[in-house]
Amino acid sequence: MIALGIEGTAHTLGIGIVTEKSVLANVFDTLTTEKGGIHPKEAAEHHARLLKPLLRKALETAGVTMEDVDLIAFSQGPGLGPALRVVATAARALAIKYNKPIVGVNHCIAHVEITKMFGVKDPVGLYVSGGNTQVLALEGGRYRVFGETLDIGIGNAIDTFARELGIGFPGGPKIEKLALKGEKYIELPYAVKGMDLSFSGVLTEAVRKYRTGKYRIEDLAYSFQETAFAALVEVTERAVAHTGKEEVVLVGGVAANNRLREMLKIMAEDRGIKFFVPPYDLCRDNGAMIAYTGLRMYRGGVRFKIEDTVVKQKFRTDEVEVVWD
């Protein structure tokens, strides 16, 4: 069975084509701005402009035609309304034109589900990106959120800090590079609130300290990372302890950070459990994860009518009954 997936929840438009066992194509185009941030209307215009050429590229890369595709999947939410609507409209049009079944996929669930292509069975997932920070796992037939950010996503916090330091966007790789040269830990507010996280306090204090001119930016970058990532690992470890799961996966754009990977790996080794990070092109927002999750859903008996494909900007993971595992 071949599934085509369209991702477009935020600034990345991605189209993926997969089978149960392999990725045939996974192409994307990301809207970038010098100052960072995403305007929903601009994201929608970007997606609308690039959908046809990107679809053509995906089909060529996979070596298939639309007639060969068995299923259309799309990111139904959560995300930016205008961007989601462009993707949903395109998915509906393809499904109707080529008489294919259609499935709407929860973007956050897809980030975790794609790891199952690599043999992961039942993990606790730490999903970290610009707008999202969640610890989630399957419990009682649904993906439960065991902890999440109460304010801003870790990726947005890092990018905002980088902007304040004047080192540009995207900030993640630049902060990581600076942090490697850090020699001294500077105390910052800890980001754990029960099982949830808050990054506004650590961000505000790091910026305040930077503006005093008394601290090296390398030390501030190092301290920011250590403080924020320690909180992420702590909440993930608590979820592991609560659920008794024996696998941890790291997904989302911030999964590119080597220090975060290292800290999670140490935690997993200490607990005697497995740790896995997918290849980066399957960590970031991408169409292949949407296609793969849609395929698993369809195989498990999930069916959508066209009227079921309305986008959901605030689509919670626990709204989805997982009947396909």
UniProtKB/Swiss-Prot annotation:
The organism of origin for this protein: Thermococcus kodakarensis (strain ATCC BAA-918 / JCM 12380 / KOD1) (Pyrococcus kodakaraensis (strain KOD1))
An annotated GO cellular component: EKC/KEOPS complex
EC number: 2.3.1.234
Entries under Pfam families matching the protein: TsaD (PF00814)
Name of this chain's protein: tRNA N6-adenosine threonylcarbamoyltransferase
Record text on subunit structure and interactions: Monomer. Component of the KEOPS complex that consists of Kae1, Bud32, Cgi121 and Pcc1; the whole complex dimerizes.
Catalytic activity: L-threonylcarbamoyladenylate + adenosine(37) in tRNA = N(6)-L-threonylcarbamoyladenosine(37) in tRNA + AMP + H(+)
Keyword presence, GTP-binding: no
Residues that coordinate or bind Fe cation: H107, H111, Y127, D285
Recorded name of the encoding gene: kae1
Alphabetized GO MF terms: iron ion binding; N(6)-L-threonylcarbamoyladenine synthase activity
Free-text remark on how the cofactor is bound: Binds 1 Fe(2+) ion per subunit.
